[in-house]
């Protein structure tokens, strides 16, 4: 299981000067090798990772060391492989129609290079609250204090250093192949063993961020309204400030970028908390598999109004929720599967038939055959689970669940 620890660096003025120069050179390496690979791609040629790395290696190895150049080039390879994977998924019809995969971007913000340092695991070591960097080419060696707790134990991997424009701070991200993790005040071996063998279905939504139905009939809802509030608050603030910029003839600014980043950070924090609480609860219920419904094509529905589009594209962060579900569930030995949620909101759990217009008011589902009324999101969660589990305990009271 791979995870990363993020620590805030506390460099002196002299150390920050070295970090800035080193990280700017790192950004140059990324941009140079990315340029060569983009040229090959747009000319219709196979992207030659080895050839392009060798070119950039010779250009920069004396400045920041051969190992550092290699690590940055190989991180760029990962971005390209992810892009090619998305292209394959697009060709196979596995992605929404509106989604168009794009090649890796350059490290630039408003014309300025975005700082990046990537080091191999033998180029750094940690002593107390001090990070020691070595093998840095003409920069040789650098020692920097850090603030934060390393809450993971295991084999250390690649280290990255970035600069956060929003907080105006330097951060290091250290990857681990994790064996133990601090939970509370105790070191716990991870991944854990599941406490049972049940499966749970999860329907993702707006007012209910997650509706959860377990095959034994247990169910609960996870509130999504605070996430909407975060989005509406920042939308108004950003729109007001953007209006002022427009009047002055300016399209963007560092402050505007910081506002967008703060909105993302707040939304991500809420999602992280909600997902962890959900997974912990499912672990206690004996769940070993989570089945999540993914609503293809809904995030860019042009027929919806601007208000609804904002919710779907900025608040309804399906990909972030699913990614965090996978990451947190892995710690508990729980497997996450993603299925197409098509027709899950229209099928009655009791009669088993699909009904158009059964969702007659917000959050309610009424079966025209049985006359029963359920929570619409829990109906979705039940039917999502049914795509993977054929025998499910139908608990009618569980389909009326309140937020837990």
Q: Language-model features: where?
A:
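Generic detection of short hydrophobic beta-strand segments and adjacent strand-loop junctions
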Residues: 5-9, 139-150, 220-225
């Amino acid at each position: 299981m791979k995870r990363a620890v993020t620590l805030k660096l506390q460099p002196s003025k002299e150390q920050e000067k070295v970090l800035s120069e080193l990280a700017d050179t790192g950004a140059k390496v990324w941009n140079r090798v990315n340029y060569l690979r983009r040229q090959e791609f747009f000319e219709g040629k196979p992207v030659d990772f080895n050839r392009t790395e060798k070119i950039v290696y010779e250009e920069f190895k004396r400045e920041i060391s051969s190992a550092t150049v290699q690590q940055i080039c190989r991180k760029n390879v990962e971005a390209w492989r992810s892009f090619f994977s998305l292209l394959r998924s697009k060709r196979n019809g596995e992605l929404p129609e509106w989604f168009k995969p794009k090649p890796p971007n350059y490290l630039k913000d408003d014309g300025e290079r975005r700082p990046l340092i990537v080091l191999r695991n033998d180029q750094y070591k940690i002593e107390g609250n001090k990070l020691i960097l070595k093998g840095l080419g003409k920069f040789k060696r650098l020692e920097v204090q850090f603030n934060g707790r390393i809450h993971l134990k295991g084999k250390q991997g690649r280290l990255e250093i970035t600069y956060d424009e929003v907080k105006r701070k330097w951060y290091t991200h250290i990857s681990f192949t994790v064996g133990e993790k601090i939970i509370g005040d105790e070191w716990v071996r991870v991944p854990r063993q599941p406490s049972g063998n049940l499966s749970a279905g999860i329907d993702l939504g707006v007012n209910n961020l997650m509706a959860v139905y377990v095959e034994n009939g247990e169910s609960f809802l996870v509130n999504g309204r605070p996430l909407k509030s975060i989005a509406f608050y920042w939308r108004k603030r950003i729109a007001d400030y953007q209006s002022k910029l427009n009047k002055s003839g300016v399209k963007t600014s560092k402050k505007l970028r910081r506002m967008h980043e703060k909105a993302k950070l707040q939304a991500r924090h809420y999602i992280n908390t909600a997902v962890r609480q959900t997974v912990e609860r499912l672990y206690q219920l004996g769940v070993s598999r989570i089945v999540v419904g993914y609503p293809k094509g809904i995030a860019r529905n042009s027929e919806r109004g601007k208000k609804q589009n904002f919710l779907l594209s900025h608040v309804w962060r399906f990909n972030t929720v699913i990614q965090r579900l996978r990451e947190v569930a892995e710690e508990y030995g729980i497997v996450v599967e993603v299925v197409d949620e098509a027709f899950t909101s229209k099928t009655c759990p009791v009669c088993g038939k699909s009904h158009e217009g059964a969702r007659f008011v917000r959050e309610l589902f009424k079966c025209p055959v049985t006359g029963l009324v359920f929570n619409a999101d829990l109906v979705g969660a039940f039917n999502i689970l049914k795509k993977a589990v054929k025998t499910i305990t139908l608990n009618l009271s569980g389909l009326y669940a309140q937020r837990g």
